[in-house]
Amino acid sequence: MRESIAEIAQALGYPYQVAEEQVISGVAIDSRAVQPGDLFVALQGEQTDGHRYLSQALERGAAGVVISQADAIDVYQLQNYILVQDGAVFLQQLAHWLRNKMNIPVIGVTGSTGKTSTKDFLAALLSSLGNVVVTKGNHNNELGVPLTICQLEPDTNALVVEMGMRGLGQIDFLCKIAEPAYGLITNIGKTHCELLGSQENIAQAKCELLAYIPEHGVVALNSNDRALVAPWLETCKGRIVWYDGSGQDVTADYRAEEIVQHETGITYRLCYGEHRQQIDLAVHGVHNVSNSLAAIAIAHQLGVAWEQIGEALKQVKLTGMRLDIAKAPNGVVVINDAYNANPDSMKSAISVLMHQKGGRKVAVLGDMYELGKYEIESHQEVGRQAAIQEVDYVIAVGQLGALIGKSAQEAGCQVAFATDNNQAIQYLQAYLKADDVVLVKGSRGMKMEQIVQNLMG
């Protein structure tokens, strides 16, 4: 961004003071992340109060601050400030104002799983358009989305916004800020059933995106979810395109055929109308066929050429802890998929494990959260899949992970049960030898990267 404090305050209708006008180059809500020229927004929350860190923000070079406590002006002898009622509301208003100053394609990305990987694919595909601003990390909520939008620069050519959801109305709220003209929904899974009760309710929440797609816009939807999203399709004014990463739906606009997993990634044949093209992905997991297709659909609709699509996908590197494969000092191959877990990604990760060359195949599998009524059957299903794929050794971590282990054990797998990550590490230390391949995967709350860190020394 390249706006002054006065311009921002006047546009949004807030009182302000400027002793020395400076151009704001960014926005921060964490004083430790402030860069020279940033506008520091002091947020008040239940756990902390950003006003306590005004001095640190100014010492790090903040060009101005946004406060909701008037007494901070004298306490910290503030020179450049905007006085607001609520820092979070200000941040959202600022983002909405900045977004509407830019005549660029804005793409909203949501779905039960695969949002971040799909965003990574889309960012790579849109790079041919020029400067693309993309959600960093998991900045996909009511604070993260505005912070992403505040990264817009005069030369930005596209904006990709990941949108998370933990209840009805949240996608709607984020769309009011970002106003996406393009969108994609990766899938309607069982994650969040604990919060929303059913896949139908999850579909309703995710499909809040559709109402914001204008007549000139496009949304890409997973053909496997046709029945779930059907009630909400009429809310979309724009064009709907369907993609299918399973190779089963010949009616999908974008579909994959001849999917082949290998040790270094995945290849498949992309089909769109009469067009046929081989796609080479240097990433693992058959679920990434669907994720890449969703990104291809939007990129193609935005005018990215087929040749550029093929070349860009060869170079994609996904956000960390998503099927990262590395060799430990002791010669063990480690597959780090510890960022998060759901039933489909668990089964896909097990498939990646079994496609690796090497010695014995070991799966360290932990709890999957927020599955609601599907909790027991989903964990049991993963255990059966481990047995079907003939995993040599399963280490089941956690109370829910034990359901995976019991199911795998009943189906013939060798299984050890660990109450926590430390016990899982002890089992691995006693079992592993050079050339064994280990998959580590569980929900974010399990923090199973601790196991990976131990394995990697």
Residue ranges and their predicted role:
Residues A6-Q10, V89-S223, A227-C236, A430, ...:
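Phosphate-binding loop of NTP-binding sites
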Residues D71-Y76, L184-V333, G358-G359, R384-A387, ...:
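Acidic, Mg2+-coordinating active-site environments of NTP-dependent enzymes
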Residues I8, D38, A57, L94, ...:
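Residue-level signal for inorganic ion chemistry
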Residues M1-Q93, W97, Q356, R384-Q385, ...:
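N-terminal leader/targeting and accessory segments in enzymes
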Residues Q47, T319, A338-C413:
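Active-site beta-alpha connecting loops in nucleotide-dependent enzymes
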Residues V109, G320-D324, G445-Q453:
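ATP-dependent carboxylate/acyl-activation modules
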Residues K190-L196, I335, M368-K373, V440:
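A short acidic, helix-capping loop that chelates divalent metal ions and anchors anionic groups
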Residues I82-D86, V415-A424:
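Short acidic-hydrophobic, aromatic-tinged amphipathic segments that line or gate anion-handling sites
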